[in-house]
Amino acid sequence: MFRRNIITSAILLMAPLAFSAQSLAESLTVEQRLELLEKALRETQSELKKYKDEEKKKYTPATVNRSVSTNDQGYAANPFPTSHAAKPDAVLVKNEEKNASETGSIYSSMTLKDFSKFVKDEIGFSYNGYYRSGWGTASHGSPKSWAIGSLGRFGNEYSGWFDLQLKQRVYNENGKRVDAIVMMDGNVGQQYSTGWFGDNAGGENFMQFSDMYVTTKGFLPFAPEADFWVGKHGAPKIEIQMLDWKTQRTDAAAGVGLENWKVGPGKIDIALVREDVDDYDRSLQNKQQINTNTIDLRYKDIPLWDKATLMVSGRYVSANESASEKDNQDNNGYYDWKDTWMFGTSLTQKFDKGGFNEFSFLVANNSIASNFGRYAGASPFTTFNGRYYGDHTGGTAVRLTSQGEAYIGDHFIVANAIVYSFGNDIYSYETGAHSDFESIRAVVRPAYIWDQYNQTGVELGYFTQQNKDANSNKYNESGYKTTLFHTFKVNTSMLTSRPEIRFYTTYIKALENELDGFTFEDNKDDQFAVGAQAEIWW
């Protein structure tokens, strides 16, 4: 059958040639004609064999030598190794426009990256997150962190914090969009191999739903471009990254807000949120729930000069107390709630060679001012570890901060975090009511840039704080830290690029500990530690 097909194909292929050369063929002898036919048949058979072999290669796996080879472990090697197809640079997509064939091809080329982005946008789902994890050991037993909020994070961090966010677009038509967002955060213990949530004797393993809200665009006629949200969510946080605390933070149980509302030269963020607190009595054994509400208002992205923007912010927290709650405060020894506020401004300057610096000035009173006076973590909370207590008498505190990074030439980069703060007549969680304090903390992190993927440097941290209580007794807390590190990176920025893998050696020393009485293992005032840490966001 195959032979008959070959002959038939040969005749069909030669027919046009024979017809076009009829006049020439009439002058040839019979022998010459047979010779031409045999030559044409051989060429046709050769061509058909070529196509047949190519078809076989498509469906037959490539084989290796018939003798079975073994690998280093003595196992037989795979006689049919998988061939890896080269990743295409682009894909062809069909145009949906009806007149595409009139204007050109109905197909167009799209890079694989753009095609992947298109598919993600079409699905409308995104999964974002952050976590850190690592190993460390110290000279006196288990390594301990101390004063991260003053001495810096590198080589002083042994937690496994995570944030995981799920976002799904549920509507996007006619200029209106609706997204559902859920975020979980918490910590996974880095000390024991088991990390069950709820098995939390060491206080390490915990998780919460920190966000669960709906955000929209296009529903407000006066602000169609703004993000209007409702649910469990707070105003955006602003972090001093090297110290791991926030200059702007409004926690929320639930709320309603508007972000990126264009007004004049800048944008407005406004949020009204609920944040109930547990109000304790003076024994710190009994508590009652108090309903509080916060208004957080920010006017941001105000242009000043080239690559410089300004933000002005204000926050006010007020209680909505019941009669029984007020009675407990008046007659049963519960601490009185005092409304608290914070306002300030920040300036961000970006640099031509990359990098930035952010300067902020903040003033607060009552319980927020009390948190300005914390040397370890100094986020502007209204409580201390979730508990509201203390005799707040309207005292105020001031905070000045600087953070950022700058490139020096082609091979050096320096990051910084510097904070100066002071307060008068505040409630201190260490020295009580009517306390004054003054604090300075400074962390610098210079590094040599080997290439895009490698940096070697040192993080130097120092802080000192003095509190004076109502009787004018003075209490001092101070210390320093030196961390040598090498990092594997994906970009040269210290503060804005992740993932990052760090190898470090740290020496940390407590010079004075009159506020907290802290010691490392074996009652030592210093610690030498080595370790490795991975930090990633996506």
Swiss-Prot record:
Residues 1-25 form the signal peptide. InterPro entries: G_neg_Bact_CarbUptk_Porin (IPR050286), LamB-type_porin_N_dom (IPR021570), Porin_LamB (IPR003192), Porin_LamB_sf (IPR036998). It is a multi-pass membrane protein. It comes from Escherichia coli O6:K15:H31 (strain 536 / UPEC). SUPFAM superfamilies: Porins. Keywords: Cell outer membrane, Ion transport, Membrane, Porin, Signal, Transmembrane, Transmembrane beta strand, Transport. Belongs to the porin LamB (TC 1.B.3) family. This is Putative outer membrane porin BglH. One of its GO terms (molecular function) is carbohydrate transmembrane transporter activity.
